[in-house]
């Protein structure tokens, strides 16, 4: 089953450096949208400058990272896991945020790191994790894509609260 979590990035440079290490990715499981690995910090800052100018603000650069982990029993190839990560990023971010998707294959636990800019460059708005982009919605989109690829699922019944704690989410993934 696919487990997903999201967190704020403290240092974009460090997150990117960690994510794109050759021994973790074999150098070819990397996709970007509206940015490049080599200039990601500058690319994200350019969107931030446009946001600050349009909104008369002086915000600092902020970004987030989604970690999407796959169950080894789903027998995904690294390429398929990467394609799923890119599809997820496209659907969740709706073409409005710059992103980097990197698939790590150095362990039995294939997983994606999806680093994205908090700036919606299309509308000059900030990523809103409290309304449209809630953790619940993140998991629902992940679930839809997992179903599309016949990946095993975590039980999220309709009677569940809108929010379940990450520990409970992981416990359900393990079936405990």
Please give the residue ranges for each predicted region.
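N-terminal nicking endonuclease/strand-transfer module with a His-rich metal-binding environment
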Residues: 1-176
